[in-house]
Design a protein with these regions (language model features):
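Long, contiguous N-terminal structural blocks used for assembly/anchoring
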Residues: 1-27
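Residue-level signal for secondary-structure boundary elements
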Residues: 17, 43-47, 91-94
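A generic structural signal for short, non-catalytic loop/turn and secondary-structure boundary residues
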Residues: 38-43, 86-90
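Short, compact, well-ordered microdomains
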Residues: 66-99
Length: 99
């Protein structure tokens, strides 16, 4: 399972190192795939940060969320519901997870 998650980040992810953050983001177009993998791996999604890629840089989209659910499938569903509400071009997501 970890290999599938790492493969998704390798294929689709973008680094936030230029923003001074040691993390990576995924395009919203693969967010549901990531959430399904997290749920299958029994990882709890604690929240996430939302970015918009503009003019060759990641900018905060100010649509971050936090979740205190402890059941992996419930936390992933909460994240999915939040992300479905977002509108905009070039949206990327950074997930905060607990395994």
């Amino acid at each position: 399972m970890i290999n599938k998650i790492l493969d998704l980040y390798t294929r689709c992810g973008k680094s936030l190192l230029d923003n001074g953050i040691n993390d990576a983001v995924l395009p919203i177009s693969v967010a549901n795939e990531a959430l399904a993998l997290f749920s299958e791996a029994k990882w709890v999604v604690l929240g996430g940060d939302v970015y918009q890629y503009e003019n060759d840089e990641m900018k905060n989209f100010y649509a971050d969320w936090y979740c205190n659910l402890v059941v992996p499938s419930e936390s992933c569903n909460y994240a999915k519901e939040h992300l479905q509400k977002l509108r905009g071009d070039n949206i990327y997501i950074s997930f905060t997870i607990k395994n």
